[in-house]
Amino acid sequence: MGCFWGPDAKFGAMDGVVRTRVGYAGGTTPEPTYADIGDHTEALQVEYDPERLSFADVLDAAFQSHDPRHRVGKTQYQNIVFTATAEQRDALSSYLDDSEYDREGIETRIEPLDGFTLAEPYHQKYHLQSKRWATTVFREAGYDGADLRESPAAATLNGYVAGHDIPDAEQLGVGSSDSPEADGLQG
């Protein structure tokens, strides 16, 4: 699905996603880094609440995020869906059987997840980290790089900053009037 910054933001903004992490998977190079990725692919790890979001919903978002019929030549950006369990692999197979895609025409690889190496801190929540006001708020709240990476709020805000699923005023609880007093705020 290309560079992991975009999918990190897109999935982070999805209702039901708890956290996202970017990293490297699918290769044999020991301890991959961005500078020495070897045969790994940039990957996104998504944790979600199954009470609010199904695995099929996650797959829908993944397959809508790229053209699964397109073969990407560069290993770093290949289209791969990694499955962590046999149940996920079976669900993915059923999803593809029920989809509009011709299985023979799908270039997106499906592989078991053999390992996931976290990407460097500057890649985590990249869009959010590009906004000084946001990083200042998290830093002042005592967050370090690992806390930011693991934060559900940071995952969501990273998506909003990148322009995904931005809530409207009603979803934010902002009233329809032009005055803060009408929203129950003291002037």
Predicted regions located by residue number:
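Flexible coil/turn and secondary-structure edge motifs
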Residues: 1-187
